[in-house]
Amino acid sequence: MTEGTPPTSKATRLRLMEVAIELFKRHSVAGTSLQMISDELGLTKSAIYHHFRTRDELLDAILEPVLAEVSAIVEAAEAHRTVRARADHMLTGYAALAARNRDLISVLSGDPLVLELLNAKAEWRAIVVRQMRLFADVEPGVGGQIKAMILLSGFAGAARAEYSQFDGPLDEAAFRDQLIAAGRRTLGLRAPRPAD
């Protein structure tokens, strides 16, 4: 795209979603209006409506690819034979997703409107329930459920944190590895032995 060429519709849509996530971080989903997004982008509200008629439609577009990826991780994890192997696969896959999507994970985990939307869509709720079960099954009963909740809440909290105040910025690979290590400790999993 050369200077002066208007951005493509797809590029505008992606930029709109990026700005929405940033505003969701600052103001929550409920605290962010389409008007705020249009103001931030310098677009008219009608330009926003061209892509998304409502904030919920925008939120759907943001959530859909993430939940599709979580679903793929869940399905691959469920194919493993043992409870621990299933949990470890879910853990490593979700840690990689969280590391790639830190801003999004920090916003989407715990925002009341996001939770409401997840619960309203049966297929999305089912994905989250299956994910939780993969973590919780490591320790049957309420203890496993609590550990699963701590793990997911911890990932969201870690994604929100600003690490540069400590040792400098944390890159994606280092962040992923730290999430995996903390998750294994939380669930009582050992790292798989390296193949010879």
Residues covered by each model-derived region:
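Short, intrinsically disordered or compositionally biased N-terminal tails of bacterial proteins
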Residues: 1-4, 194-196
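Solvent-exposed, amphipathic alpha-helical segments
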Residues: 19-26, 69-77, 154-162
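Hydrophobic alpha-helical connector segments
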Residues: 61, 72-106
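Hydrophobic/aromatic-rich alpha-helical bundle segments in the mid-to-C-terminal region
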Residues: 106, 117-125, 129-196
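Short linear capping/connector segments at secondary-structure termini
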Residues: 108-114
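Helix-turn-helix
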Residues: 15, 19, 23-57, 61
